[in-house]
Amino acid sequence: LLSGLVLGACGNGSDGEGSSGDVTITYSIWDKIQQPGMEAIAEAFEAENPGIDVKVEVTPWGQYWTKLEAGAKGESMPDVFWMHSNEIAKYAEGGVLMDLSETYANSEVTSLDHFPEELVELYSADDAVYGIPKDYDTIGLWYNKTLFDAAGIAYPDETWTWDTMLEAAQTLNDPDNGVYGILAPLNRQEGYHNFIFQNGGYVLSDDKTESGFRLDEAIEAVQWYADLSVKYGVSPTQSQFAENSNMSFFQSGRGAMGFFGSWTTGEMANNDYTAANADVAPLPKGKQAATVFNGLANSVAASTENEEAALKFVEFLGTEEAMRLQGENGAAIPAYEGTDESFVNAYSQFNIQVYVDQMENAYIKPYSKETARWEDVENNALMPVFDGTKSVADVAEEIVAGVEEVLANEK
């Protein structure tokens, strides 16, 4: 964990109070595609709060957490920043995040009651709220309409099952010409975790003490997903994905179908090829319909020297007004109840409603205090499965032992 954060967190990333008496606070994010939406929110806030300027800073995901951790240990943290489910526990326990429960309990413009309970719980600990839900995301089955039309196959819909998808992938598969029926990389949130839930399994037990790889339902689901490449050959291999991402395959017309989160919608819209040739459908059903869902949050540095301004801004970020601006600007599906249509309408060229509708069958992205550690255990153990040299049954015990060791050490 981030031991030493409490002692180190003494600065902040803002410019503080300028000579004019204005206060500038920093708002740190990691997604450039969402930057226009976040800046629109900042401008609306500034218009309602003269004297407070908000500086939106974008740091790519790969460097974001390195920079934030360094800031937490004493250099400087941004005043307000995005938080992720994989990281919240260590930052909350490190004492570097401000408790926002009182701000929201006393707010006259918003309330935690407007957000999905699972997301509020995700960013809370010991009766304190360390992040205000910003958005939510689910996973969809994107498909290439042009390839489907050429093959005379009906587009995917809510009736599709694993078998329907496999049959379509086999028909569409044309590896000799560099086109694959489906894109199935070794990926948890957009990939095999969805299939575990669809098969009636789970990734972690409710009490976060056991790995779902104890169960046949998980083993069967992950094997079926891996077999898309290693048995059926309808997906590129993992070595191919090491050279080209699933998005790169899809956006160049070399993948007829792929699993992509709602956060990729802007990327699909901004790409000329996918804007003209692609659309999205619900995930196929196994024993049941299911998708993983997650959501980001907005947090405030406990070390901020601009506490009043930062709290005002994070309160505004949770209002219906700010959430609608987020959706209208195509940034993400807003977490505030009743505002998700703003995102759907921003991308009317795609059937984005499927992302919203799938919340009826959504399972919160598996998490614990040390999510990234047990995710690495899963990933490393499954590599030979996705290379075709081992089966999931061969590595299940290794996953169970490794994941449950991480979980046991969290207590």
Segments (PLM) and residue ranges:
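Hinge/lid segment of periplasmic solute-binding proteins
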Residues: 85-140, 163-166, 277-281, 342-358
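Extracytoplasmic/periplasmic substrate-recognition and gating elements
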Residues: 43, 47-48, 53, 151, ...
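Short, well-ordered beta-strand elements
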Residues: 20-32, 52-57, 79-80, 130, ...
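Glycine-centered hinge/linker elements that transmit conformational signals in sensory
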Residues: 169-171, 208-239, 283
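Long, aromatic- and glycine/proline-rich binding clefts that accommodate carbohydrate-like moieties
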Residues: 278, 328-380, 384, 409-410
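Extracytoplasmic "Venus flytrap"/periplasmic binding protein-like
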Residues: 44-115, 150-152, 249, 253-257, ...
